[in-house]
Curated annotation (Swiss-Prot):
HAMAP family: Transcrip_reg_TACO1. Pfam families: TACO1_YebC_N, Transcrip_reg. One of its GO terms (biological process) is regulation of DNA-templated transcription. Belongs to the TACO1 family. Keywords: Cytoplasm, DNA-binding, Transcription, Transcription regulation. The keyword tRNA processing does not apply. Signal peptide: none annotated. This is Probable transcriptional regulatory protein OCAR_7305/OCA5_c08120. The lineage of its organism: Bacteria, Pseudomonadati, Pseudomonadota, Alphaproteobacteria, Hyphomicrobiales. It comes from Afipia carboxidovorans (strain ATCC 49405 / DSM 1227 / KCTC 32145 / OM5) (Oligotropha carboxidovorans). SUPFAM superfamilies: YebC-like. It comes from the Bacteria. It is found in: Cytoplasm.
Length: 248
């Protein structure tokens, strides 16, 4: 099994189903508002807000929408969202982490638990699977921004820990603490990245059958479609055949 990493699969799958633009923009706006409320409304001085704005631009969210979401925080938005991390196991014993921003903890927990249960998995306690992931920073550039060698050299100089280059682009991994500085250094050389954010990176991926893979994608679809869910991570990989089918 050649194995496509689950991270790429989820990103491609999410992009496919996120044709529902209003839902996507709503999630992005929520993260922008929360990030601006927790820190300064200036993306240059607020790494989390910077990451949220980059994500919004990657989805072609209108500039007015982005600015409105930032101003909503500055205007004392009365809505308060709790940041919650859910952890559990999906089909095939695959570990899944779900990050959510919700104004109703009970509703979110009930819905997410239901998705896990119906998929044949189960929702666990916080910490039940996160030990199988590393909390790291990732900076992404399109492949045409630099050669693999040039990107590797620049990333090392910027203090990055690892680089993965392919025809799909460059992924530069950093520690949590060095993400912001590394991103600034690379931006000075290659321009604005398409992404710069903290993620949960699996330490190892589990190769699953196509049957289990389809069940996992169904679970991930349900999770990503939930209004409160911001990010989903899992530690599996599927065959090239299923990856092509899911992306098609």
């Amino acid at each position: 099994m050649a194995g496509h990493s689950q991270f790429k699969n989820i990103m491609h799958r999410k992009g496919k189903q996120d044709a529902m633009r209003s839902k996507v923009f709503g999630k992005l706006a929520r993260e922008i508002t929360v990030a601006a409320k927790l820190g300064t409304p200036d993306p240059a001085m607020n790494p989390r807000l910077r990451a949220a704005v980059l994500a919004a631009r990657a989805e072609n969210m209108p500039k007015d929408n982005i600015e409105r979401a930032i101003k909503k925080a500055a205007g004392g938005d009365s809505e308060n969202y709790d940041e919650i991390r859910y952890e559990g196991y999906g089909p095939g014993g695959v570990a899944v982490i779900v990050e959510a921003l919700t104004d109703n903890r009970n509703r979110a927990a009930s819905d997410i638990r239901s998705y896990f249960t119906k998929s044949g998995g189960n929702l666990g306690e916080t910490g039940s699977v996160s030990f199988m992931f590393d909390r790291v920073g990732v900076i992404e550039y399109d492949a045409d921004k630099a050669s693999a060698d040039d990107m590797l050299e620049a990333a090392i100089e910027a203090g990055a820990d690892d680089v993965a280059s392919s025809e799909e682009g460059h992924e530069i991994y950093t520690s949590q603490a060095s993400l912001s500085e590394a991103a600034k250094a690379l931006e000075a050389k290659f321009g604005e990245p398409r992404k710069a954010a903290l993620i949960w990176k699996p330490q190892n991926n589990i190769a699953v059958s196509d049957e289990v893979g389809e069940k996992l994608f169904k679970l991930l679809d349900q999770l990503n479609e939930h209004d409160d869910v911001q990010n989903v991570y899992a530690n599996f990989e599927v065959s090239d055949t299923l990856a092509a089918k899911m992306a098609g």
